[in-house]
């Protein structure tokens, strides 16, 4: 009897995060076998950030309070770090095993405008690490979650360069009122030499290297991000990398439409991932699959067993994207019942020599699009990352290493009301082949199809229509 009581107490003390959702329903009637991800298991210990010296007054820096609360929970084997309503200014947050960062309604975590608060410093020498430090991070951890109804604000405008062509006169004036530096041509504003915040490097180019992602999990297992709003990250909003068992459910991601590298959800070389019920309005790609470039991508491995359903993407460079770097490959991906409204492209497959890999078992079905400003479905194999100040390489396609191999992709039941072009594919021989697109309705404004002869795409029962001429 004593053993039974102890077992029951242990069961009550350690509980799996309840997602208030039957995730099993997303794993029925699949065209490819996908394992269902394992939810994180979090001990039922509770700590409030307020009990660790935290203040939600919008003035106090809470970096030490978050570190203290996480350390306290970690010593107990994990638990829930509760953040009540308030505005919590902070620097870097590092999560540990078996911890749930829970934001209650009207709780706002805001990352500091002072870039020094978001740069890792060597504890021995006091020197800055010469790389960007992700605002919320976990490395080689298991059973991690970020949940609740609150907001995480990346304060991205203090980090990102802005192109003059992408802002109004009023917005351009507002940026200049922050101080900063304007390029000699007057076409770029940099958050360098700001009025109220110090530089963290001697040049604009060096400071750009410190621009960070909002949330990054690396080599972790059993991750849940649910319910929260991710706002205005300096770079990508969330990027799990080489992780297994990842669920991203019901989050809102929002940043300015012109936010450089403002990707919403990027999955990099991960296995067993479920992405459902999210709403995205991003500055760059919406839901993007990555797999590393070159040898490092091959070593990291493919994105594998990815299930993407019931999401809505508003502005983004692409609603669903593969690339540009995926040398590790893409395998067993389902994209079903998603809506894209106002994205630059709907389904976007982009890569280039030295960045490409092989796709296998990619199934895309029942996608609904309206007001697509560019192509509804697009394949490109000469993509280059046009970041601020970049110059396109002259010999980008000369050496045939890590060549894109877009193949075994099956697209069906895509319904488009309004796009510039329907289906576009540009690539050299062997880069785009064994693609099927069938049973679709595409209402376009300029061109139904623009497919190179080298691209082997089978288009079946696709109804193209446009305005009467």
What are these regions (language model features)?
Residues 78, 92, 112-113, 155-159, ...:
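Short glycine/acidic-rich loop motifs that flank beta-strands on beta-rich extracellular proteins
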Residues 2-82, 87-100, 104-219, 224-226, ...:
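Extracellular "leader-to-stem" segments immediately downstream of a signal peptide or signal-anchor
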Residues 87, 242-244, 252, 291-293, ...:
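Active-site-proximal loop/turn and secondary-structure-junction residues that shape catalytic pockets
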Residues 326, 337, 346-469:
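Extracellular beta-rich repeat passengers
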Residues 105-106, 142-150, 221-231, 244-256, ...:
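Right-handed parallel beta-helix
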Residues 55-57, 294-298, 328-329, 355:
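Short, small-residue-enriched loops and turns at beta-alpha junctions
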Residues 93-102, 241, 328, 356-357:
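Short, surface-exposed basic-aromatic patches at helix termini and helix-loop junctions that form
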């Amino acid at each position: 009897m004593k053993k039974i009581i102890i077992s029951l107490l242990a069961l009550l003390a350690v509980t799996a995060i309840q997602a208030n959702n039957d995730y099993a329903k997303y794993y029925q009637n699949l065209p490819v076998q996908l394992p269902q991800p394992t939810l994180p298991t979090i001990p039922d210990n509770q700590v409030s950030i307020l009990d660790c010296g935290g203040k939600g007054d919008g003035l106090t820096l809470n970096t030490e309070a978050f570190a203290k609360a996480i350390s306290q929970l970690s010593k107990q084997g994990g638990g829930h770090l509760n953040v009540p309503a308030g505005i919590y200014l902070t620097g870097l947050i590092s999560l540990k095993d078996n911890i749930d960062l829970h934001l209650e309604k009207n709780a706002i975590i805001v990352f500091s405008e002072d870039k020094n608060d978001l740069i890792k410093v060597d504890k021995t020498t006091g020197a800055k690490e010469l790389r960007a430090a992700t605002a919320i991070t976990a490395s080689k951890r298991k059973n991690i979650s970020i949940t609740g109804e609150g907001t995480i604000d990346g304060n991205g405008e203090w980090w990102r360069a802005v192109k003059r062509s992408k802002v109004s006169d009023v917005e351009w004036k507002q940026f200049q009122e922050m101080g900063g530096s304007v390029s000699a041509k007057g076409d770029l504003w940099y958050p360098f030499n700001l009025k109220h915040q110090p530089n963290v490097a001697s040049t604009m180019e060096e400071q750009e290297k410190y621009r960070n992602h909002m949330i990054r999990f690396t080599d972790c297992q059993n991750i849940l991000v649910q319910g929260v709003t991710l706002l205005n990250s300096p770079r990508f909003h969330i990027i799990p990398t080489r992780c297994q068992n990842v669920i991203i459910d019901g989050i809102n991601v929002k940043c300015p439409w012109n936010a450089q590298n403002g990707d919403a959800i990027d999955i990099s070389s991960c296995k067993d991932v479920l992405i459902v019920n999210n709403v995205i309005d991003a500055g760059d790609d919406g839901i993007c699959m990555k797999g590393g470039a070159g040898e490092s991508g091959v070593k990291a491995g493919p994105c594998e067993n990815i299930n993407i359903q019931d999401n809505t993407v508003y502005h983004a460079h692409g609603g669903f994207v593969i690339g540009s770097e995926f040398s590790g490959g893409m395998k067993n991906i389902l994209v079903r019942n998603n809506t894209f409204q106002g994205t630059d492209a709907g389904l976007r497959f982009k890569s280039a020599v030295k960045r490409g890999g092989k796709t296998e078992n990619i199934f895309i079905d029942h996608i609904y699009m309206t007001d697509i400003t560019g192509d509804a479905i697009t394949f490109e194999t000469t993509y280059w990352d046009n970041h601020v100040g970049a110059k396109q390489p002259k010999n980008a396609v000369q050496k045939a290493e890590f060549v894109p191999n877009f193949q075994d992709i099956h697209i069906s039941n895509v319904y488009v009301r309004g796009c510039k072009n329907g289906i576009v594919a540009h690539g050299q021989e062997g880069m785009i082949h064994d693609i099927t697109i069938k049973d679709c309705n595409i209402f376009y404004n300029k061109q139904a199809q623009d497919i190179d002869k080298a691209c082997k795409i089978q288009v079946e029962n696709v109804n193209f229509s446009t305005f009467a001429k």
